[in-house]
Amino acid sequence: EAHTCGHDFHAAMLLTAAKILKENESMLSGRVRFMFQPAEETFEGAKDMLAHGVLEGVDAALAYHVGSGRMPVGLFMYNSGGTMMYSVDGFRITIHGRGAHGAYPHSSIDPINIGVHVYLALESLIAREADPGKACVLTIGNFSAGSAPNIIPDTAVLQGTLRTNDSASREKLVRRLKEVALKTAEVFGGMAQVEMISEVPPLVCDPAMTDEMVSYMEELPIPGLTPVPDTSASASEDFATIAERVPSVFMYLSAGYMDERGDAPAHNPKVQFNEDVCPIGSACLAHCAVRWLEEHQ
C-alpha cells in the first residue's frame, strides 16, 4: 500500500531547511525545532509527539503540505480568518446479531440488515441534523460482513469518518452518531459497539501569525511565488492538535503540473508531485524561521 500524499517531499524540504539553518546558525535569534511528524495518515503522529514533549519550550509552529493538481508551482494557500482544514473523527461500528442459514432468516438477528439501516440513519444526520450553514461530511468507506452467500453472519462492521469545520457541529454529530448506531441496533434486536479511531479537531491557524508568515514569504525573490488566501479544505490534518496549543500556521504549497501530469489527485497511485516545489519549500521554511525569531526576540 502507498499513502501517495507527498510526505517524502515534506521530509526532503524540512531536512534541507535544517541544513540551511545549521549552516547559517549565527543568523538565528533563537532555537528552531524540526518536527518530522509521523503517521499523519492515521492521525496519530502529532498526538504521540506531544506526549513525548515536542512542544516543550516551543512558542510557535509552522507547517507545510504539498498539493497536487493542475496548478503551477509557486502558489501557497493559507487561511488567516477561519478553518483551514476540517476535523476528523474516524469510527468503527461493530454490529452484533445472531447468525443463521439463509433459508431461515427468521431465526437470525441479521447484522447486515441492521448495518444498512445504521448507514441510512447516519446519512440522515447530515441531511436533517447538521446546520446547513456549516460544512459537515460523513463517509462510510468500509462495510464488511460474512464470507458465504447463503449464511447470515453474526457480525457486521461499518467504518468511516465524520468531518466538520466547527467544534460545535463536531461535538453534536459525534454524540448523535453514537446514539443512532446504538439505538438502531436495539430496534432490530441486535447490539452495536462504537469505537472512535481518530479524534482530531478543526485546524484553525493563528490570524496574526499567518499574516506575518505570508509577509515573510513575500520577501523572497522567488519567481511565481503567489499567495492564495482564504483556503479551506474538507480534508483533515492532525497538526491541528499542535495549533490548539501554540500559535500556528499551516499552508499548502502547490506541487502540481499544468498538463496531464496534474490530473491524478493525492492518494491516487498515479499522482505526480512536481519536485520544483522542494527548494521553494525549504527556502520559505528557513526564511520564515529566521524572520520570526528576529521579530520575537
Task: Show where each model-derived region lies.
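Generic recognition of short, well-ordered alpha-helical segments
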Residues: 16, 44-47, 106, 172-175, ...
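Basic side chains
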Residues: 19-22, 33, 163, 170
